[in-house]
Amino acid sequence: MSKRPISVEELIGKSQSAEVISKPKFLSKSERQKLSLQRNQEIQDKKRQQSTVNNGAKKRYNNSIEDNPEPKKINKKLKKGRNFNFDWDEEEDTSNNYQPLVRYDNRTNPPDLGLSDMHWSEKQIDDMTTRDWRIFKEDYNITSKGGDIENPLRCWAESKLPAKLLNILIKNLGYDSPTPIQRASIPLALNGRDIVGIAETGSGKTLAFLLPLFSYILSVDSNYLLYEHQQESNFNKPLGLILAPTRELALQITKEAKLFGDKLNLNVVTIIGGHQYEETVHSVRNGVHIVVATPGRLIDSLERGIINLSNCYFFTMDEADKMIDMGFEKSLQSILNYLPASEKLETTIDGKIFNIKKRITLMFTATISPPIEKITKNYLMKPGYLFIGNVGEAVDNINQQFEYFGARQSSDEILDPKKLDKLFSILRFHKDENRNYSIIIFANFKKACEELAYELSRKGFSDNTVIHGSKSQEARERAIDSFREGKDKILIATDVAARGIDIPNVSLVVNYQMTKKFDEYIHRIGRTGRAGNKGTSCTFIDDGDSEVFLDLKKFLNKGKKKCPEWLLKHSSTQSQILRD
């Protein structure tokens, strides 16, 4: 039986009651406060009832542990108030009665670990132990030999450099902390020790010898510097000499030296090929304190009497291994013979004027070869050997890539279509992936550099420039400045022309032709990945380069880099395995 429908009267009644319920009722302020107090009282009553039950259990638990618990002292300074308000009662917090075995506040009384447990960076230099220095050297990958090697430099403030030199270094030039080669070599050089520094290009060697050199000159008798050195008979007698293998490196060193020299009122002169002798004569007319030179032009200047090294007791050879490779071994020996002997300091007044007991000779090199050892033995006195990093091993921050072309197909490998197409492809990809790119392309011959520049311009890479030995000095300087300033994005160069050039932020190095000497491969790829930056190298290689395959394999294995499959399977590397 179906249910009867609702009557009209009932329907009207429900509608009226719903309207009453839905219509808001406005209360006065006093009524709202009264209602709020009533609700809060009901909540507190419920909490109090629940707390009575919990407190009974809590007291029974506390009495079973300790009859008279000691009240916990609270540091008023630390307890500024509760950060959170939970639903339960504060009396329910059992952590207030926690009794630690040892009372200790981490925030107010840090533990005294003792000097032996502190890291070397947290200690004063006088508190450093033998173990601390060993850890310090490991941190910066510094090793040494030669006996009585002084501890490295922890920071500029702890060095013995003159205050005015430190002020220029830190405040004016912004050198916050030393590099590993600077940490290791500066303390030795400041104490007059001869040094053989083995470090790669780009490790900060320039400051490693410039700072001790300027420090030495500032220690020379002030009356000599102000008066006697200014006499016409001493105008061409430098107090320090720096030799570099190439003109570009010499100019680079000069530029950095003048940052200090100009502020210290010391004259720095460059003697390199490509400049007229009259320019050198004019440069030393007002006196010279430091000479930066290449070996060949310096010997010419010495023979012509333009320069006199009789007062030069501070001598530096930068990239000495490269000077030997370029055939300057005899020139180096001749220059060393022009320098005054240490005995002169003992037998004349020079010892008091120049404030040293022996001539100081610094030599920086990437490798130790027999000619380097010969020069060291004959001309350096009990040198300290400083090894920075793993010289000769693969650089971790350089991604080394290879393009293997198998057997050499074309007699003219420069214009090989496959190699050119691959080069264009690599350059386009790198350009698209890197907004601020800077690329160096190495070739073995001057003609190859010129042909590559022409082909690149044809394919839309007109922002390239070329340097090689046949370029005039002015043209080479102009090309390097243009590349360094970013006007040209691609530099095409031979090894000799590019050795020692410090171009920051090179993002890609392309070895369009593999070098015949494997050491040069290391120097080439070292143009990128400097100062902690990541870099990429790409090397074009074929069977015609098999004479360096074994060295390349050893180099990659030693640096824990992945060897390409073609290199592992090549006959030139397999035959060595059988012999071993």
From Swiss-Prot:
The keyword Acyltransferase does not apply. Transmembrane segments: none annotated. A motif (Q motif) lies at residues 154-183. The keyword ATP-binding applies. Residues 23-75 are annotated as: Disordered. Residues 422-571 form the Helicase C-terminal domain. Disulfide bonds: none annotated. One of its GO terms (cellular component) is cytoplasm. A motif (DEAD box) lies at residues 318-321. Belongs to the DEAD box helicase family. DDX23/PRP28 subfamily. Component of the U5 snRNP complex. This is Pre-mRNA-splicing ATP-dependent RNA helicase PRP28. It comes from Debaryomyces hansenii (strain ATCC 36239 / CBS 767 / BCRC 21394 / JCM 1990 / NBRC 0083 / IGC 2968) (Yeast). The gene is PRP28.
